[in-house]
């Protein structure tokens, strides 16, 4: 199963683009910060991740306020067929009420 849920905030956004079939694609960079316990040791986790949303989800991503924590759900895929870089493909999102 390839499913990812991440609480993050949008820190960069690109203009919406359209596929040849007319599907809107929104691209952004997400930032995530948290503290987790691994093997009994507290660990700070900070990361930025490229993300895209297609179709109806692109409109929702465009309306997300920059810097506001949001719960994103989706999957990971290669940026392109021959790339090693992963991109988070967002399919759902909901505000968490935290910022």
Regions from the language model: what does each represent?
Residues 1-99:
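Single-stranded nucleic acid-binding surfaces, predominantly the OB-fold ssDNA-binding core
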């Amino acid at each position: 199963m390839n499913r990812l849920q991440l609480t993050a905030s949008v820190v960069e956004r690109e203009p919406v683009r359209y596929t040849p079939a007319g599907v809107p694609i929104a691209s952004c960079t997400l930032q995530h910060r948290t503290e987790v316990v691994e093997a009994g040791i507290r660990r700070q986790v900070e990361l930025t991740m490229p993300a895209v949303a297609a179709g109806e989800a692109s409109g929702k991503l465009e309306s997300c306020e920059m810097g506001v924590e949001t719960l994103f759900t989706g999957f990971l895929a290669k940026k392109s067929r021959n790339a090693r870089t992963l991109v988070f493909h967002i399919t759902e999102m909901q505000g968490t009420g935290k910022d």
